[in-house]
């Protein structure tokens, strides 16, 4: 949306801690090293600048300013490392907030899923195939943890093989929402189904070029992207089978 302005305010102890006006003041101090000059640049009075800084320091978990006395230019004021990180966090939250607002226009993004929404507005990945699902079960097979993930629209769970340490680090439990990613070269195409092959589905070739094919699972319109090495071997609308190895699927989740 054009001309959209989203103002971020952070409160601590039920009192205003930081807002756009205070952020600008801190950034001016960061640039010039002088509260007096920073107040002029931020177009506020010196007294108002001091009032803002005093109010922030009063409730801040750590000091925001450090005074340097003496020296060639008579000293000045600098931001503490905590204040610099606070500004970085504020910028990050502003960008995240703006991205989040823009996905309101994309009705394909469900807003009742934090993982889905977060991934859509912040995650950039080279993996062409990205799906969201929920953990159905976990099994230990040959010292590996095989995670079954239910993906809406697929007849059987996608199986992902990860280490037991990864399972613990991701805090996987039944029904936890996860994201699955795998690159196009990892999607293998065959004319007939393979025996004892997990993650195998019948699909139709929707589009085809010299490098890749878009394959559609007819029952739910879920699409996969696969790299092709011999495009002349396949035809549009041809029914084929695809499979993805368990260890070539990346599993991600929110903490």
Swiss-Prot record:
Keywords recorded for this protein, A-Z: Activator, Cytoplasm, DNA-binding, Molybdenum, Repeat, Repressor, Transcription, Transcription regulation, Transport
Keyword presence, Transport: yes
SS bond list: none
Purpose of the protein: The ModE-Mo complex acts as a repressor of the modABC operon, involved in the transport of molybdate. Upon binding molybdate, the conformation of the protein changes, promoting dimerization of ModE-Mo. The protein dimer is then competent to bind a DNA region, upstream of the modABC operon. Also acts as an enhancer of the expression of genes coding for molybdoenzymes, both directly and indirectly.
Principal location listed in the UniProt entry: cytoplasm
Region described as Required for dimer formation and molybdate binding: spans on this chain: 125-133
Domain Mop: 124-191, 194-253
Protein name, UniProt field: Transcriptional regulator ModE
Signal peptide from the UniProt entry: none
GO biological process: molybdate ion transport; regulation of DNA-templated transcription
InterPro entries, sorted: Mo/tungstate-bd_C_term_dom, ModE, ModE-bd_N, Molybdate_resp_trans_reg, Mop_domain, Transp-assoc_OB_typ1, Tscrpt_reg_HTH_LysR, WH-like_DNA-bd_sf
Subunit structure and binding partners: Homodimer.
Subcellular localization: Cytoplasm
DNA-binding residue intervals: 34-80
Transmembrane is among the record's keywords: no
PANTHER family with a match to the protein in the record: DNA-BINDING TRANSCRIPTIONAL DUAL REGULATOR MODE, TRANSCRIPTIONAL REGULATOR MODE
GO cellular component: cytoplasm
Annotated family: Belongs to the ModE family.
Organism: Haemophilus influenzae (strain ATCC 51907 / DSM 11121 / KW20 / Rd)
Pfam families membership: HTH_1 (PF00126), TOBE (PF03459)
An MF annotation (GO) of this entry: cis-regulatory region sequence-specific DNA binding
Sequence segments annotated as region (I): 1-121
